[in-house]
């Protein structure tokens, strides 16, 4: 059967595999075709993360199915205790401290962090693809009011300018 394998930002390939192939073998094929190291790949089928030790048939992946590849960074995340405070949360804490007492400020920050994490957990792969597509194709912003680009003079305009002087 043929599978379509696509990366988040649009690269894709078609691979011929059997339903009895392991996910680990599929990662090896993806690595060869799309040049993404196996250890950096997360393979998703219908939003479900595929485990290396399972077979494609375990997920009922059929012919002409589409598999998404999410590339994860190699670096290991820092332990929770040694993480540097994020500037956003620091500044938000300063703003809240102007309006609330220390205990209320801390409680509000914890609530906002929890809601932020919950919102991030609800983001789908489709949402990320749509955001990436928008960010990669959006038009440049117009010049702010009051600033103009220098005027390019055509040969006719230069002659007109000289005639006026």
UniProtKB/Swiss-Prot annotation:
GO annotations of cellular component type: cytoplasm
Pfam families attached to this UniProt entry: Tugs, ubiquitin
Domain of life: Eukaryota
Biased composition (Basic and acidic residues): 146-165
Entries under InterPro entries matching the protein: Ubiquitin-like_dom (IPR000626), Ubiquitin-like_domsf (IPR029071), Ubiquitin_CS (IPR019954), Ubiquitin_dom (IPR019956), Ubl4_C_TUGS (IPR041421), UBL4B (IPR043317)
Alphabetized UniProt keyword annotations: Cytoplasm
Entry-linked Gene3D superfamilies: Phosphatidylinositol 3-kinase Catalytic Subunit, Chain A, domain 1 (3.10.20.90)
Span of domain Ubiquitin-like: 1-76
Region (Disordered) residue spans: 139-165
Coiled-coil segments: none
Keyword Lyase listed: no
Remarks, miscellaneous: May have arisen from retrotransposition of the X-linked UBL4A gene during mammalian evolution.
Name of the protein this chain belongs to: Ubiquitin-like protein 4B
Organism: Bos taurus (Bovine)
Protein's gene: UBL4B
């Amino acid at each position: 059967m043929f599978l379509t394998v696509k990366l988040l930002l649009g690269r894709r390939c078609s691979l011929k595999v059997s339903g009895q192939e392991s996910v680990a073998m599929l990662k090896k094929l993806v690595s060869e075709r799309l040049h993404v190291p196996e250890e950096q790949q997360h393979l998703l089928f219908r939003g479900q993360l595929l485990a290396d030790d399972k077979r494609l048939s375990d997920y009922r992946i059929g012919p002409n199915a589409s598999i998404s590849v999410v590339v994860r960074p190699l670096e290991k995340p820092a332990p929770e205790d040694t993480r540097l405070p994020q500037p956003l949360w620091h500044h938000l804490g300063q703003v809240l401290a102007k309006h609330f007492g220390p205990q209320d400020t801390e409680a509000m920050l914890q609530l906002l962090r929890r809601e932020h994490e919950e919102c991030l957990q609800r983001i789908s792969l489709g949402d990320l693809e749509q955001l990436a597509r928008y960010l990669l194709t959006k038009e440049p912003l117009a010049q702010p009011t009051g600033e103009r680009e220098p005027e390019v003079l055509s040969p006719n305009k230069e002659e007109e300018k000289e005639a006026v002087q």
